């Protein structure tokens, strides 16, 4: 409970709010990248507390929102095949394609099942050798390792009826697209702590330098987010544009190396 209590402490949060409001000499516009951060910000009313000194714009960090229509239509075409057992996380079932969604395919007789892990999909492939089991692999960098592990495990076990519809996206191109937009107002980012725990933050450094925006790797609890905002506002006030790490308890600059040895990061 230490980390839960420490990063949800109301007194610490109030102190950080005062610090942010005292530091800001003008209105600053920040974007949190991750949907988990957005959830905390909205649930705790942090955006309302900090307005008008800091405006928070909610970012693209939801796999459901960034999965392309083309990929959804591919998933629907596969799920409708009688020889396919199609598996997906539950939040993808009602995402519409050009004509319908996975829930409707299931209602029409398609074998569409909700799983909680790609390894669950692999287990279904083992149990149903007469079906081609497809896992809809959506998400950012954080979901890629588990999906890769399932494919590796399938190869180890010699499971030939398991496949993955890969729909991964990465965060940096999304940030660049936002910054390149003619109507962009974002002046700094809170980067997703869990993504950076896997990838590190080196790929954000050129973005910060090129676009002159502070990028703060940030966790998900209220105190995490307020600390991240405080660091970003301080950089903006001082005219600095760097990558800083608020989420020091989980993230290292180089992320997790291929051998998984975090001591080297």
Annotate each PLM feature:
Residues 30-32, 113, 134-137, 163-165, ...:
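Short catalytic-loop micro-motif centered on adjacent basic/acidic residues
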Residues 165, 183-252:
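A conserved active-site cap/scaffold subdomain adjacent to cofactor or substrate pockets
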Residues 264-265:
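Conserved small/polar residues in nucleotide/adenosyl-binding loops
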Residues 1-130, 144, 148-157, 165, ...:
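Metallocofactor- and cofactor-centric catalytic cores in central/energy metabolism, strongly enriched
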Residues 136, 140-203:
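Phosphate/pyrophosphate-binding betaalpha-module
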Residues 71-74, 126-133, 177-182, 204-206, ...:
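Short, surface-exposed amphipathic charged segments that create phosphate/polyanion-binding patches used
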